[in-house]
């Protein structure tokens, strides 16, 4: 190589180095995708839209409002005077210290993740990068309705910024994961009418890049059935006193989202008094009547609802079950596919969670009893079933609320013949309780790593 050629090569190399430096500087200057934090069931404050009185979370029952929705045959039109305001950042009762819910996660994203919180209605000039938006929503309502609201808000921001190609990352806790999955698969479309099968369009791929599902019950939860039968429990404790927030089964009956958290079709594990498997179709109203589950048959029902609501109750109940079934079918309609969106599952399985039910006919009353917890009982023939025997069939690995089986959608994935029906890039397990996942520092740091492009692709990574 002569001197002139060497000079040319040096010149080309220098220009290439300058170009690469400029390109890397440009990429660094672009900032990170904005992220959306979606809470789970009961994770948003609910206020009266006229008086601004906070109804949830509020330990002492309001004198003017409760959480029950008006009963209508059309589940998608069930609204009242309550609207979602902020996410639940912490819960404080009386003189006791506040309990972190999502406030710690937001702070971690700001201090360790390099994000800043923005408002949907009035984003700053740079609200399209390194930003965090909280998606508070009325968690009582139909999940499809809330998924469509999410897409509408995202599209609205993109128009405000005049950035049609802008994409958001999502961190969705618990039921929020079902909302984000539907938004990703179907965009702002409703469930198909009648008996038409859902066909995922992955319309959400134009809006979303990464979705982190944090403790999401992808196959539902037996606890939701328990809530519909016995009332809503907070921390496995059922409280229903006159001066405390109503959590009775009559309140839960009016909440469409409660039905949509039932175990997905053909995933419920049920056993008889011999602890042998029995087939139960949760989405057949006749089954609810057979086992004494239908709250409409309760003697107190008429005293809890108006005459108009009593007339509509059966139509509403059947519609709520049907829509819940169709939502689960829609979420399972693209097994193993992700539509170009990266899904990450982050959860816990170091504890236990209710995984099934046992149905027993009472020898004295001839009525059915439904067991969710391992409590010993005596069969009609006098033989006993111990708590330890029940524990083996009723309880599975999980985070106290969601089983690992539901979190990973294992039953549906196995039936579909795919590794993950959710199409997840990876599964990560960190030892924590369901309601404390977002507040866990290890979970926060792991999610920050995912958002920064450092998420592992190794299946079944576990940290105890």
Language-model region placement:
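N-terminal secretory signal peptides that target proteins for export/translocation
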Residues: 1-11
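Bacterial N-terminal signal peptides
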Residues: 13-25
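N-terminal non-catalytic accessory region
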Residues: 29-171, 175-263, 267-282, 388, ...
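Intrinsic-disorder/low-complexity loop/linker signature
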Residues: 52, 126, 272-275, 291, ...
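Serine-hydrolase catalytic core
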Residues: 274-288, 296, 333-339, 345
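C-terminal subdomain of alpha/beta-hydrolase-fold enzymes, centered on the catalytic histidine
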Residues: 299-464
């Amino acid at each position: 190589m002569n001197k002139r050629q060497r000079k040319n090569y040096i010149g080309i190399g220098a220009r290439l180095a300058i170009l690469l430096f400029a390109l890397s500087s440009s990429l660094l200057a672009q900032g990170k995708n904005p992220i959306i934090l979606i809470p789970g069931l009961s994770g948003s404050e609910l206020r009266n839209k006229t008086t601004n009185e906070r109804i949830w979370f509020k330990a002492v029952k309001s004198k003017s409002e409760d959480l029950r929705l008006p009963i209508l045959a059309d589940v998608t039109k069930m609204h009242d005077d309550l609207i979602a305001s902020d996410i639940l950042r912490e819960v404080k009762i009386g003189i006791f210290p506040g309990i972190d819910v999502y406030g710690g996660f937001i702070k971690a994203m700001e201090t360790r993740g390099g994000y800043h919180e923005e408002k949907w209605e009035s984003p700053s000039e740079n609200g399209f990068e390194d930003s965090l938006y909280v998606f508070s929503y009325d968690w009582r309502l139909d999940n499809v309705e809330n998924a469509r609201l999410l897409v509408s808000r995202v599209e609205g921001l993109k128009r405000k910024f005049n950035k049609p190609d802008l994409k958001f990352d999502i961190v969705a806790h618990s039921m929020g994961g079902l909302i984000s999955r539907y938004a990703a698969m179907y965009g702002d479309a409703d469930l198909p009418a009648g008996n038409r099968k859902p066909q995922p369009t992955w319309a959400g791929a134009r809006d979303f890049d990464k979705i982190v599902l944090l403790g999401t019950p992808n196959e539902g939860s037996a606890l939701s059935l328990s809530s519909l039968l016995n009332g809503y429990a907070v921390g496995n404790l059922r409280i229903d006193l006159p001066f405390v927030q109503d959590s009775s089964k009559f309140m839960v009956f009016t909440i469409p989202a409660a039905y949509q958290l039932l175990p997905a079709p053909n995933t419920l594990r049920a056993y008889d008094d011999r602890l042998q498997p029995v087939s139960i179709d949760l989405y057949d109203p006749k089954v609810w009547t057979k086992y004494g589950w239908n709250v409409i048959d309760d003697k107190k029902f008429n005293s809890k609802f108006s005459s108009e609501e009593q007339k509509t109750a059966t139509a509403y109940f059947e519609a709520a079950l049907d829509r819940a079934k169709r939502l689960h079918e829609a979420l399972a309609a693209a097994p193993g596919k992700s539509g170009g969106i990266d899904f990450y599952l982050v959860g816990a399985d170091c504890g236990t969670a209710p995984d099934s039910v046992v149905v027993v006919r009472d020898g004295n009353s001839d009525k059915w009893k439904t067991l969710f917890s391992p409590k010993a009982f005596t069969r009609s023939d006098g033989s006993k079933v111990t708590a330890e025997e029940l524990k083996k069939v009723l309880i599975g690995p999980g985070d106290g609320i969601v089983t690992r089986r539901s979190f990973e959608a294992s039953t549906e994935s196995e039936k579909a013949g795919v590794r993950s029906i959710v199409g997840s890039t990876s599964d990560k397990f960190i030892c924590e309780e369901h309601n404390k996942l977002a507040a866990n520092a290890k979970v926060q740091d792991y999610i920050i790593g995912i958002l920064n492009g450092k998420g592992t692709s190794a299946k079944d990574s576990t940290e105890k």
